UniProtKB/Swiss-Prot annotation:
Cell location: Cytoplasm
Organism: Shewanella woodyi (strain ATCC 51908 / MS32)
Name of the protein described by the UniProt record: Bifunctional protein GlmU
GO molecular function, one term: UDP-N-acetylglucosamine diphosphorylase activity
Biochemical pathway: Nucleotide-sugar biosynthesis; UDP-N-acetyl-alpha-D-glucosamine biosynthesis; N-acetyl-alpha-D-glucosamine 1-phosphate from alpha-D-glucosamine 6-phosphate (route II): step 2/2; Nucleotide-sugar biosynthesis; UDP-N-acetyl-alpha-D-glucosamine biosynthesis; UDP-N-acetyl-alpha-D-glucosamine from N-acetyl-alpha-D-glucosamine 1-phosphate: step 1/1; Bacterial outer membrane biogenesis; LPS lipid A biosynthesis
Chain positions covered by the region annotation Pyrophosphorylase: 1-226
Residue numbers binding Mg(2+): D102, N224
């Protein structure tokens, strides 16, 4: 028996006031529908049917490389009609799990509970109790057993008083589902084919109907406009922040942090306000992350410090190392143990060795730098000749004076000293002192320029 997931993603989302299909709007830097697809994989889906309509080309350009069966709903005639478009991809013995592309916070654990609640060849529906159920379909019970779902516009006064509502998420047996979908009618206030009508059909046919509920109602809330999208974003961030704190992070203010990927932290990590973490970020023990830092696809080792307003992207920061404030580690950069870069230092595709330092105002690109090296302010590795990149090698215990340019390819030997203001175009041997600046001249009585009168 296969788990066949149908994700409804055909809506335009008019209230978003956007050319982008609604389900492509992001939560935590990932489209809503991608969150749902990932959750479907997490519950062990054997196949995913993505029912699309408006903006199909944009959807396929974003999601096209994934293992999905694309099912077109040419006309938007209701949720029942949408699911029916996938009938040819549903086997009789499938368990069909129906999800929604604009409900991104649904948890795998909730769906697992729903599937567990379903009896053999039965129908399981996910419900939730709301203090204000206005706008939602109500769960109709008799003797505590579900007998149907009534939509808001079709409900009478007694039914409108029901607080248990339909989330739309359900698990159904493939054979019966296809039969029920074929019996749907659009004879209702909306003139649509309601998926919810299959619940009454299941009751009629004597099929066991069971229910499950999520831990929080926010899991089943959708986003129809940008206000609701922002509310879901905040809910996602609150949940992600809570997870970090339970793992051992101290968050200066959990409401002022953005987590946009897979973040893992060690013990006693301190994270200040307005930090953004994106992609896969791994943080060791006793790490300090300063205010406004941005971490993207990076590794921060034990006892390291990322000072305020620094950016670490696709880079590694070793144990005891530090970066910032206002430092930038670009892809391929690595700080070894106890290395340091200070304010306005940029590194790309370069390694700064153990205990080495670049305190301020430097660019280090395509470079291999040994241990115990001092990089003076204003140092530049000139790595690009207009066509190709070249490597700079600086061996252990080198002292590079301020405002030095190293024109790659070039190698500086161990213990060498480069005088301030030098432009190095040739290799330097170990323990040499090299100075290339012009000899200082003194011109007495030099007349300074005078501004012309207008």
């Amino acid at each position: 028996m296969a788990l066949n997931v149908v994700i409804l993603a055909a809506g335009k989302g008019t209230r978003m006031r956007s050319d982008l299909p609604k389900v492509l709007h992001p939560i935590a830097h990932k489209s809503m529908v991608q969150h749902v697809i990932d959750t479907a994989h997490n519950v062990g889906s054997d196949a995913i049917q993505l029912v699309y309509g408006y903006g199909g080309e944009k959807l396929q350009s974003v999601l096209g490389e994934q293992q999905l069966n694309w099912v077109l709903q040419a006309e938007q005639l209701g949720t029942g009609h949408a699911v029916a478009q996938a009938n040819s991809n549903i086997a009789d013995d499938d368990t069909v799990l129906i999800l929604y592309g604009d409900v991104p916070l649904i948890q795998a654990s909730t769906l697992e509970a729903l599937l567990a609640a379903r009896e053999e060849n039965g129908l399981a529906i996910l419900t939730v109790n709301l203090p204000n159920p206005t706008g939602y379909g109500r769960i109709v019970r008799e003797a505590n057993k579900v007998v149907g779902i009534i939509e808001q516009k079709d409900a009478n006064a007694e039914q409108l008083a029901i607080n248990e509502i339909n989330t739309g998420i359900m698990a159904a047996p493939g054979k019966q589902l296809k039969a029920w979908l074929g019996q749907l009618s659009s004879n209702n206030a909306q003139g649509e084919y309601y998926l919810t009508d299959i619940v009454a059909m299941a009751h009629r046919d004597g099929v066991a109907i069971t229910t499950a509920q999520p831990d929080s109602a926010i899991e089943v809330e959708g986003a129809n406009n940008r206000v609701q999208l922002a509310q879901l974003e905040r809910a996602y961030q609150a949940r992600a922040a809570e997870k970090l704190m339970l793992e051992g992070a101290n968050l200066r203010d959990p409401a002022r942090i953005d987590i946009r990927g897979e973040v893992s932290v060690g013990m006693d990590v301190m994270i200040d306000v307005n930090v953004i973490m994106q992609g896969k970020v791994t943080i060791g023990n006793n790490v300090t992350i300063g205010a406004g830092a941005i971490l993207i696809d990076c590794e921060i080792s034990d006892n390291a410090e990322i000072k305020p307003y620094s950016i670490v992207e696709s880079a590694k920061v070793g144990a005891e190392a530090s970066a910032g404030p206002f430092a930038r580690l670009r892809p391929g950069a690595e700080l070894k143990r106890d290395a340091h870069i200070g304010n306005f230092v940029e590194m790309k595709k370069a390694v700064l060795g153990e205990g080495s330092k670049a305190g301020h105002l430097a660019y280090i690109g395509d470079a291999q730098i040994g241990s115990g090296v001092n990089i003076g302010a204003g140092t530049i590795t000139c790595n690009y000749d207009g066509a190709n990149k070249h490597l700079t090698v600086i061996e252990d215990n080198v002292f590079v004076g301020s405002d030095t340019q190293l024109v790659a390819p070039v190698t500086i030997g161990k213990g060498a000293t480069l005088g301030a203001g030098s432009t190095i175009t040739k290799d330097v041997a170990a323990d040499e002192l090299v100075i290339t600046r012009v000899k200082q001249r003194h011109l007495t009585g030099w007349p300074r320029p005078v501004k012309l009168k207008k």
